Amino acid sequence: MFQLIKITCFLKGFAYKGAIYMKKMMLFIIAVGATMISVFALGDAQQSYAHGYVDSPVSRVKNAEANGFGWGPGQDSSQPEIITTPQGIEAPTKLLDTGQLNGRLPSAGLASYSKLDEQTATRWVKSNITTGENNFKWVMTAKHKTNRFRYYMTKPGWNPNAPLTMDEMELIGIVGQPIGQDLPPGQGFMVNDTETHRIKIPADRKGYHVIYAVWDINDTINSF
């Protein structure tokens, strides 16, 4: 599952002018140093349901109610899967790796989640984190043998008012096999019901950023 996290970061050892304001912002995905971050995840397209999501820092889809989705007055219920199925964002890994999901990274190209692809500097609720090492917690609704988890983050100078693409992303962490070194099918490592990864946020990130978390499974052609 692909998980998108919106974060506000505060650099360790620095007094950031906007810190008081940003500390009042609610978690969206992850907060880093002086950076606001969003997180999203990609799931398994061969199943009728996907199998995992980033729970902390809270991902864009998991934080649906705070982001305006729901069944109540004034809330957006036009795409119910966003409200009921945070683990449902999924696509074949090759679509991500060949750039076919550019502009649709948060939804993984799924029409039923397309409103997650909206991208402006103010659209999404944000989480506060610091630069340096941070924990990322996944919740697995179904377990798979796994090749790796990988984490990307928007680069310094990215455009927060344009659709998200992998060209705007930098790889900041891998848990498991190096990219391009998949294990034979069925020989990946098994995950637990929850997985927590310690990922280092680069020291040069300030303001609003997005983190993109990907779970590359080993027993199908897909990623979450």
Language model segments and positions:
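Exoplasmic/lumenal beta-rich domain surfaces
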Residues: 157-195
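N-terminal "mature-chain" segments and other terminal, solvent-exposed stretches
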Residues: 48-162
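Bacterial N-terminal signal peptides that target proteins for export
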Residues: 21-30
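Short, Lys/Arg-enriched N-terminal segments with co-localized hydrophobic residues
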Residues: 1-21, 46-48
